[in-house]
Amino acid sequence: MTSVSLTVDAVTKEFNRRSIFRDVSFSLRSGESLAITGRNGSGKSTLVKIICGLLSPTRGSLAYVVDDKSIEVDAIKDHIGLVSPYLQMYDEFTGLENLEVLSRIRADHDITDAVITDALKNVGLWERRNDYVRTYSSGMKQRLKYAFAMLHRPEVLILDEPTSNLDAEGIAMVERCVKEQSSRGMLIVATNDPEEATWCVQRVVLGSEKK
């Protein structure tokens, strides 16, 4: 089993000289979990993007180690599964076609037709696999994001607003994903929901919210 560790050291992010957050530090390894909490506008999604390598910090550093080897942040994407509001699927493709196309991004992983089938079944979309995503409800689109995020059994699963647009059945699906990830990999959850924060052992609070 691949082991991953992440060290975030005094990370600060500024936009137009305005500080979004300052001096965020934490460390995680496989089998550990972290909730990123804070009021709206405190920078939770921004921090998630930095952790994923989609944004660079203004100051501070991130260090990933995979199986005792240092990995550049840009290369960590192969080890990450991400679910977030800013991750978009292809409306002009079917649900199945989305996973087939997106699986090519994971070309270094053995993603077979059977793996894609299981992913769609696990999120309850198998019966709608041949429907265009533009006909999906917002909750179904969120489920499809989970299917893609879990497709390659990521060592690091990052969830930003994890139960957005989901009904009770969808939330139960998310909780199964969280339980599976917690048993074998690293889990990071960015949320305003106190219940979702309890999925994680550690917590980073952004903004003026108190621990």
Task: Annotate each PLM feature.
Residues 6, 21-23:
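Conserved structural motif at the start of ABC-family nucleotide-binding domains
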Residues 37-39:
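The feature captures the beta-strand-to-loop junction immediately N-terminal to the Walker
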Residues 52:
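Helix-to-loop junction immediately C-terminal to a conserved catalytic motif
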Residues 60-71, 75-76:
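Conserved ABC transporter NBD signature motif
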Residues 86, 92-107:
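Q-loop/switch helix immediately C-terminal to the Walker
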Residues 100, 104, 111-128:
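Conserved ABC ATPase "signature" region
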Residues 157-161:
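Catalytic Walker B motif of ABC-type/P-loop ATPase nucleotide-binding domains
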